[in-house]
From Swiss-Prot:
It is found in: Cytoplasm, Cytoskeleton. One of its GO terms (cellular component) is cytoplasm. The gene is ARP2. One of its GO terms (molecular function) is actin binding. The keyword Transmembrane does not apply. InterPro entries: Actin, ATPase_NBD. Component of the Arp2/3 complex. This is Actin-related protein 2. Keywords: Actin-binding, ATP-binding, Cytoplasm, Cytoskeleton, Developmental protein, Nucleotide-binding. It comes from Oryza sativa subsp. indica.
Length: 389
């Protein structure tokens, strides 16, 4: 089977990344949104003809005429009907494939309900009639993209952040940590912060604009208190941004206040540990033989780890915790700890890249895939092939 017949699809909360096995970057990346027209005009407001359902990037251009819904929330598919439209768009419009002649590798966030995975596999066989399917945990794929089999993956996308220890290609679900703070929540928090500054922002209409502000201007402070003090006493942090309608707004301390929610989720009323705490606790809960290896291979993955300053902040916080909890303040022990955080430049699509690598290697290995025949004979029991049924 040639690589053109193996589809890799990473459906995230914010974007769907899809393409073919063995590729170096996704053929298509489009927002995971579905829009339905609010008004049925005989003549539409713009030149663009409104079809019944709009998927992906087209929603952004027409968002004033659409009721927009997001089928995936926090990495879990909530609306299977909408997800069907997204997959239709991916397979038929973007990749232009005939599913019955292809195999597909799908990705699944760790700690996702088994029901989600069952429904996914059911849809792939019953609706699209794929020849073979495999579902892999996202964190493991991120490591494959780095050429590793053992490491601690910190994956933060648009809807969910998780920290997963992987040893020899197997993840540990009982030690995996998950936090429902990621890109979308930070954008939403930035909308609130800008509103407090006096700019009239709307949660839905301006969401995309604020997301662009976030991607261009936000960063993580090395020391939050000192940075905040600097922001209060000087104007050194203030940057201007021109909105699509021509207004210019000034963004100051909000630039690092918004992403701070990744480390201090209480800022947006989410209980639980921040990113550094999760990573530290995750490694300390592993058996002692694997801890040092995990400290040496902390791999960042996903779009919400792209903030400037995030790797150095994470390193600082983890060293502080190690010094405090493990070494009880004895600084000499730090020399033995080789903490290494890997932040590959293309980590935004890392799960997809790992999927393309895995699918490329396995495309001719029949024992790897769940075939249509196995599905028809065994039903959902065939999920055990994915190792997590």
């Amino acid at each position: 089977m040639d690589s053109g017949n193996v589809v890799v699809c990473d459906n995230g909360t914010g974007y769907v990344k899809c393409g073919f096995a063995g590729e170096n970057f996704p053929t298509s990346v489009f927002p995971c949104v579905v829009g339905r027209p609010l008004l049925r005009y005989e003549e539409s407001l713009q030149e663009q003809e409104l079809t019944d359902i709009v998927v992906g990037a087209a929603c952004a251009d027409l968002r004033h005429q659409l009721d927009v819904s997001y089928p995936v929330t926090n990495g879990i598919v909530q609306s299977w009907d909408d997800m069907g439209h997204i997959w239709d768009h991916a397979f038929y419009s973007e990749l232009k494939v005939d599913p019955s002649e292809c195999k597909i590798l799908l990705t699944d966030p760790p700690l996702n309900p088994v029901k989600n995975r069952e429904k996914m596999i059911e849809t792939m066989f019953e609706k699209y009639n794929f020849a073979g399917v495999f579902i892999q945990v996202q964190a493991v794929l991120s490591l494959y993209a780095q050429g590793l089999l053992t490491g601690l993956v910190i994956d933060s996308g648009d809807g969910v952040t998780h920290v997963v220890p992987v040893v020899d290609g197997f993840s540990y679900p009982h030690i995996t940590k998950r936090m429902n703070v990621a890109g979308r929540h930070i954008t939403s928090y930035l909308v609130d912060l800008l509103s407090r500054r006096g700019y009239a922002m709307n949660k839905s209409a301006d969401f995309e604009t604020v997301r662009e502000i976030k991607e261009k201007l936000c960063y993580l402070s090395y020391d939050y208190k000192r940075e905040y003090q600097l922001g209060l006493e000087t104007t050194i942090l203030v940057k201007s941004y021109t909105l699509p309608d021509g207004r210019v707004i000034k963004v100051g301390t909000e630039r690092f206040q918004a992403p701070e929610a990744l480390f201090t989720p209480e800022l947006i009323d989410v209980e639980g540990d921040g990113m550094a705490d999760m990573a530290f606790r995750c490694i300390q809960e592993m058996d002692i033989d694997n801890r040092m290896t995990l400290y040496q291979h902390i791999v960042l993955s996903g779009g919400s780890t792209m903030y400037p300053g995030l790797p150095s902040r994470l390193e600082k916080e983890m060293l502080d915790r190690y010094l405090d909890v493990v070494l009880k303040g004895n600084k000499d022990g730090l020399k033995k700890l080789r903490l290494r955080i890997e932040d590959p430049p293309r980590r935004k699509h890392m799960v997809y890249l790992g999927g393309a690598v895995l699918a490329g290697i396995m495309k001719d290995a029949p024992e790897f895939w769940i075939t249509r025949q196995e599905y028809q004979e065994e039903g959902l029991a065939c999920l055990r092939k994915c190792g997590q049924a």
